[in-house]
Each structure stands twice: as structure tokens, then as C-alpha cells.
Amino acid sequence: MTDNRPVIGITMGDPVGIGPEIIVSALDDPFVYTVCRPLVLGDEGVMERAIDLKSARMDVHTTDTPAGGKYCHGTMDIVPLSRLDAATLLAGHPTPGTGKAMIDYITTGVDLAMDGKIQAIATCPITKTAMKLAGSKFHGHTELIADRTHTPRVAMMMAGDRLRVVLVTIHIPLCEVSARLNQAEILATISLTSETLKTKFGIPEPRIAVAGLNPHGGEDGMFGSEELEIIAPAVEQARSKGITVSGPFPPDTLFFNAANHKFDAVVCMYHDQGLIPFKMIHFSDGVNTTLGLPIIRTSVDHGTAYDIAWRGTADPSSLIAAIKMAALQATITGANRINR
């Protein structure tokens, strides 16, 4: 009988962070197996140690290919990509070896997705420190995956049931935001948001709101001119392309309306403008998904949590949500391909 559940590659993340234990907790939830076939890309010994930590009733089944998985609750299918000495790993203390391993998990997942052998990847957290120890030139998942897939433009969306936010600028100092904003970048982010909501979220006519930058949306230029000179023209240009978009709106009122389903996504000018309201609502179950990639990639919206790693107390809610979203997007994009 044909199994239509998408195969979701779950990258283990930093071995000395909370990734391994939240994977065990997530795969201990029978519901995960109703929406997908989860395949761990990581280290067999580390995952066995995490299973022991959580006292989970779970067997480990290794396979060299996604086709060899069993995909049934109570069995963790894993493609073993490293052979770390699990007994000697110190929680919160990355090494060049753990850094290289976590990069291998990511690149293997990307390659499998690009080859169509899995339908999506859901990534567990990593750190810039571990990547640097491994000699990587990249600072995080997004840059690494964009480079691996030869993708020139990507954007970060934080998504939950009540709110979705997409960022124009991401990890830059607040004092540099205004200088970095331009009409082309804002237009590209709006366009990418619209296309993703259609193709990966199944929203045929997405409603997009755009946040202003300054207090009260600049108050007709009294508190800043970015709304008049940069943001509003980008919104008008997006509208002329047939995108249902409005704004710029003062952020202090915008997010109330967005969280009450008046918009399908909000395009934000900088990191904290979007993430503060998002995490107020979706602190435990938010998902980070990368827009613009030729593959589906979702991720937890938290870090490695070195301070609580390997204590068995980490909350798996965000990973479960990321797996569910990856499965949903895989199902929607698969249907889109069939209908074309």
C-alpha cells in the first residue's frame, strides 16, 4: 500500500545542545507519525543517550537511505552521519568535532531534499560558536542552506496559528536599520511573502500588511521620512503587481489586528519589531521557516539552550510545530505540482 505521508528529515542540531532530547520527546508523540514519516539525520550514539535520558520506550533503526526507514511510532529511524563519543560530550561545550557533525547533518538534509528523497527538513538549533569551531564561513542555517541550494535571495518568516511575520532586515544593529532599508528590498520581501503563502501555505489570495518604521508611522514625516520615501512606494509597487498588500501601518496597532486574523502575514522592517509581538503569542510553538528556497525548511524558533541541555527538561513544542508545518507544506506543494 502506498504511504502518502511525506518524509521529513530532522537534523539533530548541536549535539551538546537540546536538539537530541527534543527530538526524542517529539517522536514520542504518536501524532507526529500521523502527519509524516520522520527521519533523524544525526548521530546514533548521541540519540541513544538522549533516549536513555528521557527514559523513552523507543528503538533505534539505522538506515543509509530514506527508503529504508520503518516509520512507525516506537521506532526512531536515523541516518547515522557521525560517530561521536556520546559518553564524553559535555553539555553546552561545543568542539570542532561536534561543529563539523552538525554541519554534516544540515548539508545531508539539504542534499536529500534537493534530490527529492525527502520532502522537507526540520532543523534543530545550532550555534555560531560551533560553526566557527568547525571552520565554517557561515553564521547559521539560513546562509549555509542558501549557499548549498544556490539561492540568491531568502527571507525569514516566523509562523504560528495566530501570527506570521517576515523580516526585511535581520541580524544587524538597530542603528543601521534605516540605512539598510530600500524600496527594492521591501518589494522583494513582500513578493516572496505573497508567493510563499500561496504555494506553501495554501492561501490563494494572501493579505499582507507592512509595518512602518517610525513611531505612529512617521506622522506624515514629522518623526521620520522612511514611510513616505521608501516603504509606501514599495507597497504601491507591490500592489501594481497584483499583490494584496496594505500599509505602512503604525506597528503599535498593526499586530493587534494581525493576531486577530485580519492579515495573513506582516512584513516587518527589523528583527525585534517582528519577533517581540510574535514571541509574546507563540513563545513555545513558533516556527521559523525560510522563504525563497527550492526546498522546504522549517526550524524551531529557539536556540541550543546550553544552560538546560541534557537535563531532560527541554520543551519540544516548537520542534513538533516545525515538523507539522514541514509536513503541511510538503503536502500542499505536492498537491500544487499535481494540479499544474
Curated annotation (Swiss-Prot):
Residues that bind a divalent metal cation: H171, H216, H271
Primary subcellular site in the record, as a coarse category: cytoplasm
GO biological process: pyridoxal phosphate biosynthetic process; pyridoxine biosynthetic process
GO CC list: cytoplasm
Residues bound to substrate: H141, T142, K279, N288, R297
Cofactor: Zn(2+); Mg(2+); Co(2+)
Pfam families referenced in this protein's UniProt entry, alphabetically: PdxA (PF04166)
Location in or out of the cell: Cytoplasm
Keyword Ubl conjugation among record annotations: no
InterPro entries per record: PdxA (IPR037510), PdxA_fam (IPR005255)
Catalysed reaction, written as an equation: 4-(phosphooxy)-L-threonine + NAD(+) = 3-amino-2-oxopropyl phosphate + CO2 + NADH
PANTHER family: 4-HYDROXYTHREONINE-4-PHOSPHATE DEHYDROGENASE, D-THREONATE 4-PHOSPHATE DEHYDROGENASE
Summary of the function given for this chain in its UniProt record: Catalyzes the NAD(P)-dependent oxidation of 4-(phosphooxy)-L-threonine (HTP) into 2-amino-3-oxo-4-(phosphooxy)butyric acid which spontaneously decarboxylates to form 3-amino-2-oxopropyl phosphate (AHAP).
Family, similarity comment: Belongs to the PdxA family.
Miscellaneous notes: The active site is located at the dimer interface.
Name of protein: 4-hydroxythreonine-4-phosphate dehydrogenase
Species the sequence originates in: Desulforapulum autotrophicum (strain ATCC 43914 / DSM 3382 / VKM B-1955 / HRM2)
Gene name as annotated: pdxA
